[in-house]
């Protein structure tokens, strides 16, 4: 599976892009302008992490003391043969609204309405994680090595090249 990110707009407060998966436009991306990944080829891995569990009560989303849950998160591997044990301080895909609180070269997924702001990020992030999980299960069932490649291209214009879209192939 190949995932392409075309960076379209470079502004002082954000780097806006579009994610294309399997020849279809999946969602928009957002990155911090001075801490984004350089353009190139990367691999994606799913890593299980321990996260505090949110309490069942609707009061202020307090965390339950001492209770954790296992969450699988997509991580961008900067070195090809090294898979980290944790996702702390790693480049990864995250939900969010704006790039200014981003760290570690992470990428926000969502629907872009204005330059530097995305909406519906939780929905896009969950769909992306589900898509990656299905791909890993499909590859595991066929006894093939799990290869998910991420290609980041600095495009600089709003139009995505037609040869990357499915209807023009």
Describe each PLM feature range.
Residues 1-148, 152-169:
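Cell wall/extracellular polymer interaction/catalysis modules
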């Amino acid at each position: 599976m190949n995932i392409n990110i075309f960076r379209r707009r470079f502004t002082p407060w954000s780097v806006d892009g579009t994610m294309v998966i399997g020849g279809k436009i999946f969602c928009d991306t957002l990155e911090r302008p001075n801490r984004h990944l350089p353009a190139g080829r990367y691999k994606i891995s799913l890593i299980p992490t321990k996260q505090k569990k949110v309490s069942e009560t609707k009061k202020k989303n307090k965390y339950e003391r001492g209770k954790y849950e296992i969450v699988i998160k997509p991580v961008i591997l900067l070195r090809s043969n090294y898979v980290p044990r944790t996702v702390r301080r790693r480049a990864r895909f995250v939900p969010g609204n704006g790039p200014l609180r981003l760290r570690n070269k992470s990428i926000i997924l969502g629907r872009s309405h204005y330059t530097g702001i995305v909406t519906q990020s939780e929905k896009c992030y969950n769909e992306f994680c589900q898509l990656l999980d299905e791909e890993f299960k499909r590859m595991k069932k066929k006894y093939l090595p799990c290869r998910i490649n991420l290609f980041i291209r600095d495009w600089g214009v709003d139009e995505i090249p037609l040869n990357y879209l499915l209807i023009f192939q």
